[in-house]
Amino acid sequence: MLIFELSKTGRQAKAQIPRAVSKNYSIPEEFQRKSPPRLPACSELQVVRHFTCLSQKNFSIDTNFYPLGSCTMKYNPRGVHKAASLPGFINRHPLAMDNESQGFLETLYKLQNYISEITGMPGVSLTPMAGSQGEFAGVAMIKAYHQSRGDTARDEILIPDAAHGTNPASAVMCGFKVVEIATAPDGDIDLDELKRKVGPRTAGIMLTNPSTLGLFMRQIKEIASLVHQAGGLLYYDGANLNAILGKVRPGDMGFDVMHLNLHKTFATPHGGGGPGAGPVAVGKRLIPYMPLPVVKKTDSGYHWATRQDYPQSIGRLSCFMGNAGILLRAYFYMLVLGKEGLLRVSEFATLNANYLLKELTKVGYTAAYPDRRASHEFILTLNSEKKNYDVTAMDFAKRLLDYGVHAPTTYFPLLVPECLLIEPPETESKEELDAFVAVMKIIREEASKQPDILKAAPHTLPVKRLDDVKAARELDLNYFATHE
């Protein structure tokens, strides 16, 4: 039930918080409302019950297992939230002078250095406010680099067919033509096709390593050599950095620029429309083009770098320093774990994925790439279940909800039919993984004997199966549009 449906004229809830502003102010007439806001008239108890009930319907990492592939839904430690909320951080005004912000600036400077060490890239900018914005910034730097050299004929970005959807979007937004590279049957990039398509028009290639197939790209050195010899640059999509943290660095693999998803690898909060952060790290040749602001250290302390320091910068992506609260959480996460702890993150992430893959194949599921070792995630293909029982990957995903497990990513990457992309992060215990295997075994047995149970799932949730096409084409977010 929507809160508007509880509304009844005359009901109201009095605010029980002190007034935050003085009564002695005036709003210019042109900014004043011409009619009162159409707020629901409800009692305080109704409001409390309504939102409490909604909160109990939420599914989160704090409540249940969340094996959403390519999303790294790991636990967000409460201690880092507390540290990032220290008064010296949260009470600082964005326009505070440098000499009044030395602790804050020093923290960001250290974070830049930590990211540089983790990625193997000397330049770091923290300003992008999401992974997708960091990705856009990275491609924009590639474009700025080629343009500064007068190499304007480079108008193509090479992207594998298993890439995240943001990759081609970022390339197109920066004015490039997307050239797709096929995946070979073994899950690696088709090198022969890459050799045919790379050339004088190639500005760069965008790769995720490990890929969205959950497989490490074994020919990365050869790929880097081919693209660099052609005059292009390598972009690293940092979505799957959790798999190689402390083991291998993108800069050492030959990448020139990358973004980091702090909400994945470094345990900052997911979702809700933000706030987010997607810092970018770059090789030496792209440092002049980094987005501002960045923090520099001088004899007099820590300061914001300016256009004078980076005259070729692609500019600003936000008014201030991105989403500082998220950056602080990532900093404290790194500080708490340390170098050895971050190494164990990738070790346990890959251990969990390979253990879970092995156990699921034991109960009858089919790995999309049975001859390859999983990185931090893996793909099951339910093509045989669809043929034998007439149930789809979506049916399996919906049925998982009835057992209190969030569905894995479905139908991505598109090149694997009827696929589930499963990622069990390092924070999950063996007991949790075993429980998931037990549920998956039950659901597979249901599919073989009572397929209609899966086709009608979920059975325990207030919202069943939505009409996705209708929702996309007839977006209705205004209650009063249909309830006048």
Curated annotation (Swiss-Prot):
It comes from the Bacteria. It comes from Legionella pneumophila subsp. pneumophila (strain Philadelphia 1 / ATCC 33152 / DSM 7513). One of its GO terms (molecular function) is glycine binding. It is an enzyme of class 1 (oxidoreductase). Keywords: Oxidoreductase, Pyridoxal phosphate. SUPFAM superfamilies: PLP-dependent transferases (SSF53383). The glycine cleavage system is composed of four proteins: P, T, L and H. In this organism, the P 'protein' is a heterodimer of two subunits. Disulfide bonds: none annotated. It catalyses: N(6)-[(R)-lipoyl]-L-lysyl-[glycine-cleavage complex H protein] + glycine + H(+) = N(6)-[(R)-S(8)-aminomethyldihydrolipoyl]-L-lysyl-[glycine-cleavage complex H protein] + CO2. GO terms for cellular component: cytosol; glycine cleavage complex. This is Probable glycine dehydrogenase (decarboxylating) subunit 2. The lineage of its organism: Bacteria, Pseudomonadati, Pseudomonadota, Gammaproteobacteria, Legionellales. The gene is gcvPB. The keyword Oxidoreductase applies. Signal peptide: none annotated. Its EC number is 1.4.4.2. The glycine cleavage system catalyzes the degradation of glycine. The P protein binds the alpha-amino group of glycine through its pyridoxal phosphate cofactor; CO(2) is released and the remaining methylamine moiety is then transferred to the lipoamide cofactor of the H protein. Belongs to the GcvP family. C-terminal subunit subfamily. The modification N6-(pyridoxal phosphate)lysine is found at residue 264. Its cofactor is pyridoxal 5'-phosphate. One of its GO terms (biological process) is glycine decarboxylation via glycine cleavage system.
